[in-house]
Amino acid sequence: FEDAKKVRFFKSNSETIK
């Protein structure tokens, strides 16, 4: 499951957009 990196990036992006 190499989606951990994507999830981290997505979470970071979400926080930035907030």
UniProtKB/Swiss-Prot annotation:
The keyword rRNA-binding applies. One of two assembly initiator proteins, it binds directly to the 5'-end of the 23S rRNA, where it nucleates assembly of the 50S subunit. This is Large ribosomal subunit protein uL24. It comes from Serratia marcescens. Keywords: Ribonucleoprotein, Ribosomal protein, RNA-binding, rRNA-binding. Part of the 50S ribosomal subunit. GO terms for molecular function: rRNA binding. Belongs to the universal ribosomal protein uL24 family. The keyword rRNA-binding applies. One of its GO terms (cellular component) is ribonucleoprotein complex.
